């Protein structure tokens, strides 16, 4: 799912390149799946701050504050902003001081209501301080993520900030076997509201919608990256590639789109400067077919019935064996490719294509072994691989083998 924008504690197919840039392979642009209430997405896509679009109040280069600036995505972003020409001044906010120079450090917890005082003189806030780690207790994680976003929005409004940039994920669109490929940026947010990381991000999206209506003088930008890869990125998606097999379900095929953290940082720079507004997606152009992914990774696929896969995954989650709800498994077996139209219109292009992103992911996985999203020691990983169990939920593969053997004996 999303990256661990952590608290440490956070090639396109050669076939039909025209279609892959902007049209669905299933008829419509984005489909019309029932999702959020009509009009809610339009609020985010159409909102602009008072005055000229893309310019913060007062004119000139904006003063930008970045939360979570001492680590992960936030650290990468403040480093880029400090070296760039788009931003006038960078305020780095975290619960401890980081090592980036050329910025002003303000040490505070993003959940502290006193944050408003730390935003004095700030034009734009980019909120990256999220805990999306697979092993974090779900209730603690949600409290941190949702309360943090809520405090940032409230403090920004109280402090007269002109724009807040929130980072969620393209996963909020949901992964479905009938998803258009690609999804349009204004497609309904169809992910399930549950106890997963995606549930946290949906709550943050809802906070953004409410802020749009309650604070018309403050613009909200929401950035939704595809599956993140890069240094320090640790998610259930990246762990899918640490397993001995790639899981697929019968009758459906995932298409794979990635977003390198460097590309996300460059997109956030544009958002901070007001050059891209509203809600938009970021990722590599196009997508990879299952056969391409298998060739690039050297991992074989294991195909299982959908009913068996999801029922077994649900039992494993309830038993505390796997770290994520069953709905998270949808994101490795169903498509959720997004069309990054807004960034293209702004002249932005990714530095990494999907094949290059997979190469980075494979380099990062060296020495790691995962089953059902849970990291294993070397001995356990060897046993798992020998058992032939596949992909994100290796135990599901074992269950399928046992069930098929029983059927053969009965016949």
Q: What function would you assign to each model-found segment?
A:
Residues 23, 107-147, 155, 159:
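NAD(P)H-binding glycine-rich loop region in Rossmannoid oxidoreductase-like domains
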Residues 39, 44-46, 353-411:
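Amphipathic terminal alpha-helices
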Residues 193-221:
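Active-site Tyr-X1-5-Lys
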Residues 238-248, 253-288:
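Alpha-helical substrate-binding/gating segment
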Residues 267-326, 368-376, 404-411:
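Mid/C-terminal beta-alpha module of Rossmann-like enzyme folds, strongest
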Residues 307-349, 377-384:
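A hydrophobic C-terminal alpha-helical subdomain
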